[in-house]
């Protein structure tokens, strides 16, 4: 399975992880209560979130989009939910631009950067 990375750079010059197959309906997505891996969320107060709660889902999406690998994005990010939450997410400008570009190219949707 091929993956692509955005030309936008994330923290410490890491490319923003946007897997080619992120919107594949066959990919299982995390749901319910999740505990984020240490490489995404490395400090307290909590590593556990309830994805049914909008505020928790926002925090998970922010952290995964900033710190996650392609596999993390595949596992935690539902692109329909991402679209619905996009305006409320606090993301670095390069991450926001990379995902806005993805939505423009793959869904024909213009999102504010």
PLM regions with names:
Residues 1-113:
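Long, compositionally biased intrinsically disordered regulatory segments in eukaryotic proteins
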């Amino acid at each position: 399975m091929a993956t692509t990375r955005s030309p936008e750079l994330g923290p410490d010059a890491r490319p923003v992880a946007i897997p080619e197959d992120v919107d594949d309906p066959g990919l299982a997505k995390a749901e319910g209560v999740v505990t984020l891996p240490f490489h995404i969320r490395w400090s307290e107060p909590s590593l556990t979130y309830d994805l049914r709660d909008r505020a928790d889902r926002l925090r998970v999406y922010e952290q995964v989009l900033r710190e996650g690998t392609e596999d993390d994005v595949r596992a935690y990010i539902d692109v329909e939910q991402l679209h619905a939450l996009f305006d409320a997410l606090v993301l670095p400008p390069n991450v926001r631009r990379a995902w806005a570009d993805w939505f423009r190219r793959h869904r024909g949707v213009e999102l504010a950067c």
